[in-house]
């Protein structure tokens, strides 16, 4: 039972990191586009 959670934990961590990176990238793009349009 100790062997199965290890790959699952790694997959969850990879999914979380990719999700956070995607949100950060979207936020940066939103700030850039908002500043571009408002200026």
UniProtKB/Swiss-Prot annotation:
It is a single-pass membrane protein. The keyword Zinc-finger does not apply. GO terms for cellular component: photosystem II reaction center; plasma membrane-derived thylakoid membrane. Coiled coil: none annotated. It is found in: Cellular thylakoid membrane. InterPro entries: PSII_PsbL, PSII_PsbL_sf. The chain crosses the membrane at residues 18-38. It comes from the Bacteria. Keywords: Membrane, Photosynthesis, Photosystem II, Reaction center, Thylakoid, Transmembrane, Transmembrane helix. One of its GO terms (biological process) is photosynthesis. Belongs to the PsbL family. PSII is composed of 1 copy each of membrane proteins PsbA, PsbB, PsbC, PsbD, PsbE, PsbF, PsbH, PsbI, PsbJ, PsbK, PsbL, PsbM, PsbT, PsbX, PsbY, PsbZ, Psb30/Ycf12, peripheral proteins PsbO, CyanoQ (PsbQ), PsbU, PsbV and a large number of cofactors. It forms dimeric complexes. HAMAP family: PSII_PsbL. This is Photosystem II reaction center protein L.
């Amino acid at each position: 039972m100790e062997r199965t959670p290890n790959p699952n934990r790694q997959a969850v961590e990879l999914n979380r990191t990719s999700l956070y990176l995607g949100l950060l990238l979207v936020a940066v793009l939103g700030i850039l586009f908002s500043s571009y349009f408002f200026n």
